[in-house]
């Protein structure tokens, strides 16, 4: 069973890939987009309804260069999961962000309130435009196969 929550289509892409490539009726796959370092609220609310299940988490985040960041997100999400459940695996990858994010960064850059890392934020925005990509999907499939 696959449930995902997608705001920009990134997590939907991962969820659709899983629908087409898995044949596992014993695991509940839950996908989310990242909001302030955690899963979006709808995904968290759904996870709280699950009990005595095997769960595979998958998600996307606009910032994607740090596996450590991805691990922090997954660990934060796990805090919302009832202890009767078993998280059997997880996958995170970078996802493209809406144009409004770039516009906000560019406006900030022109202001006197620009953070010191504004150029890195803009660079990350452009890098994220290519994600999730075929390599991300292959990595998701390979991880899922190892977990099962």
Regions found by a protein language model. Give the residues of each.
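FMN-binding flavodoxin-like domain, especially the glycine-rich phosphate-binding loop
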Residues: 1, 19-30, 35-148
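N-terminal beta1-alpha1 ligand-phosphate binding loop
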Residues: 1-21
């Amino acid at each position: 069973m696959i449930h995902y929550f997608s705001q920009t289509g990134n997590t939907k892409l991962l969820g659709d890939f899983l629908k087409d490539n898995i044949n596992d009726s014993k695991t509940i796959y839950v996908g989310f987009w990242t909001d302030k370092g955690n899963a979006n609220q709808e995904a968290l609310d759904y996870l709280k309804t699950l009990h005595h299940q095997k769960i595979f988490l998958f998600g996307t985040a606009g910032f994607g260069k740090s596996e450590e960041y991805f691990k922090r997100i997954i660990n934060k999400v796990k805090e919302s999961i009832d202890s009767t459940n078993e998280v059997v695996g997880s996958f995170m990858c970078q996802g493209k962000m809406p144009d409004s994010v770039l516009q906000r960064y560019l406006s900030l850059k022109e202001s006197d309130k620009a953070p010191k890392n504004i150029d890195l934020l803009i660079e990350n925005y452009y890098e994220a435009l290519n994600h999730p990509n075929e390599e991300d999907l292959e990595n998701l499939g390979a991880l899922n196969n190892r977990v099962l």
